[in-house]
Amino acid sequence: MELYIVRHGETLWNKEKRCQGTIDISLNENGRELARITGEALKDVHFDKIYSSPLSRAYETACLIKGDRDIPVIKDDRLKEVCFGNMEGMCMDDMLKDPDSHFQHFFDAPHLYVPDENGESLEALCERTKGFLVNELMPEADSL
């Protein structure tokens, strides 16, 4: 099995350096163009299926990469971005400067990252995505 992992295209919040997490922000025009370019680069690659987060930025990216090929695009909640809870929508630069913020730990010391009361722990994120890998990909894999 060959597995291609592609990140979604750019959104307005990416450009503004805002924390997105599970808030459903659509692609901007540059993000759509980047997804089309990626689709063009992958046009000769055979895909049996495309899996996507149900968030519109990821699903739209997947559909633009697929183009007019007859390939199912399957939405799966387990592929959503990590939930940053109350930090979603906030300016990342501000959070990274705040010495009391756990946000920086997410990137440089994940073992110290503590989500807020509405956020998702890295352990929960790993369990969620592991469930996707084990249940969806491993049964079909010769080896992964």
Kindly label every feature range from the protein language model:
Residues 17-18, 62-66, 138:
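Short amphipathic alpha-helical segments
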Residues 14-15, 82-87, 113-117:
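A short acidic, helix-capping loop that chelates divalent metal ions and anchors anionic groups
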Residues 15-18, 101-114:
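Short, basic/glycine-rich phosphate-binding loops at helix/coil junctions
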Residues 37-103:
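Phosphate-coordination/substrate-recognition cap region in phosphate-metabolizing enzymes
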Residues 44-46, 136-144:
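Glycine-rich phosphate-binding loop signature in dinucleotide/nucleotide-binding domains
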Residues 10-60, 116-130:
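Loop-to-helix element that buttresses phosphate recognition and phosphoryl-transfer chemistry
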Residues 129-137:
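A short, acidic, amphipathic alpha-helical segment used as a generic capping/interface helix at domain edges
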Residues 1-4:
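Extreme N-terminal starter segment of soluble prokaryotic enzymes
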